[in-house]
Amino acid sequence: MYEFRLNRLINSQQNLITQRINGLYCESANTWIDPYKPVEKAIITHAHSDHFTNGCREYICSIETGFLLRKRFGNNLNLKTIDYDKEFLINGINFSLHPSGHILGSSQIKIKAGSEIWLITSDLKRQKDKTCKSYEKLKTDFLICESTFGLPIFNWEATNEVVDSITKWVTQSEDSISILFCYSLGKAQRLLSELNSQNFKNIYVHKSIEKMN
């Protein structure tokens, strides 16, 4: 989740996005982004549970995120789904959703007000991933960037190196059952995609993963 202190931005004509007790808030549009608690109107960047709060009156998200939210949290959600790159107005403030490359349906939120452009990245990934649209590089005046693993100590191996390591391990253990643990939405689909490309047979998944596939 987002953790930052934003009192006033130098050179900004307005504090378009502020941090409140419920999360990131666009007061001009009376709209929250990935709120921590139930609110009137919420834009949801993706379907991971740490970015979604049940009980909001209205949700706005990408089409794919809407599909996943209904599968995870039920069909009674009041969802408005928006295509990527399509602008929409809320109280005169211009919003649009753009791929963040994190998981299926994940979005950056671009906000335009007057001459200023703000961008909220949410979780993002710049590596290629067959299971979702690639991260879209956008121009912005002010950037609010999710940085869960932003410290230099986090240095991930390339995808092909990880896949090669897993493939080698599973192949060497072909007389046994190999069990891989991963998050049910995002990591699981990415791993399945890579394993399928290696022509592994008889891959079974937990019911929580099957629900998301």
What residue spans do the PLM features occupy?
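His/Asp/Glu-rich metal-coordinating catalytic cores
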Residues: 4-26, 32-36, 41, 47-177, ...
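Accessory terminal helices/loops
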Residues: 171-173, 178, 189-213
